[in-house]
Amino acid sequence: MNTRLVGSEMCIRDSLKIGPGTDPESEMGPLVTAAHKAKVEGDIDQGVAEGAELVVDGRGLVLQGYENGFYTGGTLFDRVTPDMSIYKDEIFGPVLSVVRVDDHAAASKLVNEHEFGNGAAIFTRDGDAAREFARNVEIGMVGVNVPIPVPMAFHSFGGWKRSLFGDHHMHGPEGVRFYTKYK
């Protein structure tokens, strides 16, 4: 992980169009409820309190004409460590946590030791390293040179471990049983 990547996220933040979900120009809409917004912004507060470097702060976003909306802007943390709650917990909001490692083996180990297995991203110029990482990590989705592993909302979830969704949960036998009535 290098500092240029973290710096480039600032450009993404400045160009990200946040607005109502009904606006076709919006790239990111509001969070679901006031409680959801409070939870996500509380997670951001906790990350700051635990010592993560807050590079982009999305808290307190107010959009003109939508002052009562549940908007939180994109948030970027750098220098996150595995003992921090923003690393341990799944944050269902626009929060990206960067964990720096020395090599690809350390990255795979870090991902595999995590209790959740929803998705991870790797940034590299080495195609072989990206393929090896994707093969070796025990997660449902891998993004290569993208900040999130699934950039399309209609893509089915494929999380593993405690992430619930995946081929052993709603996208597998449990989902078939849920939508099937035996006669």
Predicted regions and their residues:
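Conserved C-terminal structural/oligomerization subdomain of aldehyde/semialdehyde dehydrogenase
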Residues: K17-I18, M28, I44, E67-K183
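Short beta-strand to alpha-helix junction loop
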Residues: L31-E41
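Single conserved hydrophobic/aromatic residue that forms the stacking wall/gate
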Residues: M1-I12
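Short linear capping/connector segments at secondary-structure termini
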Residues: D23-G29
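Hydrophobic packing residues within well-ordered alpha-helices of enzyme cores
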Residues: S8-E9, V40, A130-F133
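Conserved dinucleotide-binding and phosphotransfer motif residues
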Residues: E50
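Conserved PLP cofactor-binding pocket of PLP-dependent enzymes
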Residues: E53-F70, P149
